[in-house]
């Protein structure tokens, strides 16, 4: 088993447990951060009992694989009855024997080695399963953050529409604008209210979806400032997750062990027998010793050996290609992070100030009669669209960051350790 599986077992358990114990005390004081969400989900993972049971099963299988073949005790009666001189029981012979088959070719060791690889695979596959869970939780956390930001954006849109509505109403009252301008402003406010209501419902759904990973009720706060942090784009992502590669390596080791087992099956097992024979006719005793061994004339297990060797070759290729493919995905996501971060920063630095300035100027000109209400609507739409585009860029950034975290195993330290089989 890879060293990191055992080396961090106690540490990872303590980290996850500490988060789980501390969370109820801090839930009302601090916003729910990603590490806390991951720790809650890990401690509430409903699949852990099944993993513990699989570990026990794999350990039992390894113990069973190491046992020797059972001996055989038998009794044979010969010449008990028949014809001629054998018609009487006086010439009967009784034999009591002890028989033992021997494993040759390292069969028992090969069986045990293959069974032990199953324990490693159960452990490692559980770690990969938890990393997949962490990815789902992180994506749900991002979705909840973005949904909260959408609520704030919808509220801003409503505020802008209501402010414009007040300005239009004043102009309509003094007959500087026609009545339909007021009706249009009312429509804009109504649409903004609907958008806010929809955003709030979407945010509630996103929070409940996130809380469902630990059977919570969504009663937590999220820090809105987290969404603006794009510093991860400047950090080196790291290599592919050790857990994913360890699974592929363990599968290769299992394939190698299977080759050894099939090769050992090609070696024929002898059977030895020793016993005592009682000759009723003369009341004499005799010792018998014998043995047998199958002739490898037809079944040499060649097909099974070739199949196991081909599977080992496939496992070797899977390990090499798996690492290469993961490194490519990591590089692509790293580049995507930089692009998304750059887009969000440039919108914030270049587009939003200009759009906000445009809204202020158009509004000022509208109050002086230099612009129509359509100009106000267009300027407001440009501002809202720019903020929405920035939010989309941040959502894509954090989505790619979650995918990158899964590929690199960034949250592996939070995986609860399984102590069923040591």
Language-model segments: residues:
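Amphipathic alpha-helical coiled-coil segments
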Residues: 50-65, 129, 133-158, 163-166, ...
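A glycine-/polar-enriched beta->alpha junction
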Residues: 39-49, 56-71, 85-88, 96-113, ...
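Acidic, low-complexity, intrinsically disordered peripheral segments
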Residues: 3-6, 389-422
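Bacterial Sec-pathway N-terminal export signals of envelope proteins
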Residues: 27-77, 92, 101-102, 110, ...
